[in-house]
């Protein structure tokens, strides 16, 4: 049983990947109340996906304005209620934080799950172009995105040294179908 964090900078394809998983399966949307806040999640009987997914640009747990503790409490509630084989979520903000990944690793251990990180990467130019295509805003901050990309890679490697399983996938060099198949293998394996 696994908890999977899908992380990466803006424009690497996190939301595209999760929306692809949701649309290719038999997922049903649910709400769960955690600490007085209603949180969206999706479930197909085996895999639980936490986060908001609609036609917005900002999806996942970033769209739900989750705090670290709020996300961890939601993961625990979904596990307690349904015992899914896999719980996954995608984010930008928490994907750059080693402290958050460490807290998730410890939480996974406590609830009897394995913690996996699926870090999506692409060149800075590719990521910025995708963001500009999506938002129409040509003012992508290359320095900020470069810093986030480094943080995603470095924190992912570091948490791997602590016992998490870490996988890097280049979404620029691999097709959407190949990336989706890699996620399916990870959720089923």
Predicted regions and their residues:
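A conserved segment at the C-terminal end of the G1
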Residues: 16-28
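Switch I (effector-binding) loop of TRAFAC-class P-loop GTPase G-domains
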Residues: 25-44
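Conserved glycine(s) of the Walker
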Residues: 13
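The conserved Walker
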Residues: 10
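Conserved nucleotide-sensing/catalytic segment adjacent to the nucleotide-binding pocket
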Residues: 39-94, 98-99
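Hydrophobic anchor at the beta1->P-loop junction of P-loop NTPases
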Residues: 6
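Conserved phosphate-donor/acceptor-positioning beta-strand/loop module used by diverse small-molecule
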Residues: 91, 111-131
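Small-molecule kinase domains that catalyze NTP-dependent phosphoryl transfer to phosphate-bearing small molecules
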Residues: 137-178
């Amino acid at each position: 049983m696994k908890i999977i964090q899908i992380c990466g900078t803006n424009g690497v394809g996190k939301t595209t990947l999760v929306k692809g998983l949701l649309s290719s399966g038999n997922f049903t949307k649910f709400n769960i109340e955690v600490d007085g806040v209603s949180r969206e999640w999706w479930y197909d009987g085996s895999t639980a996906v936490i986060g908001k997914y609609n036609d917005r640009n900002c999806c996942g747990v970033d769209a739900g304005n989750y705090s670290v503790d709020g996300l961890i409490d939601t993961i625990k509630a979904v596990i307690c209620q349904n015992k899914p084989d896999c719980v996954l979520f995608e984010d930008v903000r928490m994907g750059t934080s080693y402290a958050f990944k460490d807290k998730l690793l410890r939480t996974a251990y406590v609830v009897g799950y394995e913690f996996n990180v699926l870090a999506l990467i692409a060149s800075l130019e590719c990521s910025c172009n995708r963001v500009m295509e999506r938002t129409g805003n040509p003012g992508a901050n290359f320095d900020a995105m470069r810093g986030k990309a480094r943080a995603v890679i470095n924190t992912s490697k570091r948490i791997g040294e602590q016992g998490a399983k870490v996988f890097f996938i280049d979404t620029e060099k691999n097709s959407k179908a190949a990336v989706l198949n890699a996620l399916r293998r990870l959720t089923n394996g």
